[in-house]
Amino acid sequence: MTAAQFTNVTVNAQATISYDGRCSSHTIMFEDGRHKTLGVILPCDNLVEHYHFSTNTSERIEITGGECEVKINGEEAFSYYRAGQSFVVEGNSGFNLRTEEIVQYICHLEG
């Protein structure tokens, strides 16, 4: 699991917001050129069955708070993840995520 805080980073103050504000994230940039995003996803409801996210590069999504179910493109079923667990999505792919509670995450851009 990743540390609860990062040092010596630059933070993009402009959030990436999707699904009418239900999902938001901020990008942090490290001195060595690495990027990560830190985000929050609000619970699904009768208006949103699940969220879909596309990837351009390989991403490791680390759940830091809450729990959710994820179905990566090409998989047949959803898999369960909770705080302390992570999953990998290849580049040029995507995944569906559904949750009944607030989920916090770190997206490690690995590609």
Curated annotation (Swiss-Prot):
PANTHER family cross-referenced by the UniProt entry: PYRIMIDINE/PURINE NUCLEOSIDE PHOSPHORYLASE (PTHR36540), PYRIMIDINE_PURINE NUCLEOSIDE PHOSPHORYLASE (PTHR36540:SF1)
UniProt-listed HAMAP family: Nucleos_phosphorylase_PpnP
Coiled-coil region list: none
Keyword Glycosyltransferase attached: yes
InterPro entries cross-referenced by the UniProt entry: Ppnp, RmlC-like_jellyroll, RmlC_Cupin_sf
GO terms for cellular component: cytosol
Protein keywords: Glycosyltransferase, Transferase
Reactions catalysed: a purine D-ribonucleoside + phosphate = a purine nucleobase + alpha-D-ribose 1-phosphate; adenosine + phosphate = alpha-D-ribose 1-phosphate + adenine; cytidine + phosphate = cytosine + alpha-D-ribose 1-phosphate; guanosine + phosphate = alpha-D-ribose 1-phosphate + guanine
EC number: 2.4.2.1, 2.4.2.2
Physiological role: Catalyzes the phosphorolysis of diverse nucleosides, yielding D-ribose 1-phosphate and the respective free bases. Can use uridine, adenosine, guanosine, cytidine, thymidine, inosine and xanthosine as substrates. Also catalyzes the reverse reactions.
GO MF annotation: an example: thymidine phosphorylase activity
Name of this protein: Pyrimidine/purine nucleoside phosphorylase 1
Family, per entry: Belongs to the nucleoside phosphorylase PpnP family.
Pfam families: Ppnp (PF06865)
Transferase found in the keyword field: yes
